[in-house]
């Protein structure tokens, strides 16, 4: 009986970790209502871009594992497809991953992406947003998204992202949040 209790306890802990663990154990992702941590990283044009550069706009800050991989390419294509709708809603798309500026530039050129991709090669910003994952001893940005309002506050967080429908989810949330703000 004691063995069964131990097994059940271990399975419970593993199950909870699987549901809530995400990409890292720190649990320090900015919460809804919190100020989004500011940062500066180089873009695919090898120019510094800071979060505060977009003050006054809605920001879709999305972290993704790797340029040129299937899920990341689908997610980027969908954000690009919907970019005009985001722009009509005073929103910008900003992608972050651990690849360097050259990789991002090649990815943007090959895939026809016109929004900013930022190089977080030291994983500092990914860590600030609790969006680092490790796979085979390599570190990547986890697939997380933060919707930040024009005042720099986090309004929505996605820690479970399905790349094929994600842009549509973000657009719907942005529309709902803007509607709620307008009615206040």
Task: Name the predicted role of every residue range.
Residues 140-184:
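Thiol-/selenol-based redox modules, centered on thioredoxin-like
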Residues 30, 39-58:
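A short beta-strand-turn-helix
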Residues 71-113, 121-127:
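Structural microenvironment flanking redox-active thiols in thiol-disulfide oxidoreductases
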Residues 36-37, 58, 142-144:
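Short loop/turn microsegments at loop-to-beta-strand junctions
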Residues 52-73:
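Short active-site neighborhood of thiol/selenol oxidoreductases, capturing the structured segment around
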Residues 113-115, 132-135, 139-146:
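Structural micro-motif
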Residues 4-6, 10-38, 182-184:
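N-proximal helix/coil linker or "cap" segments that precede and/or mark the start of modular domains
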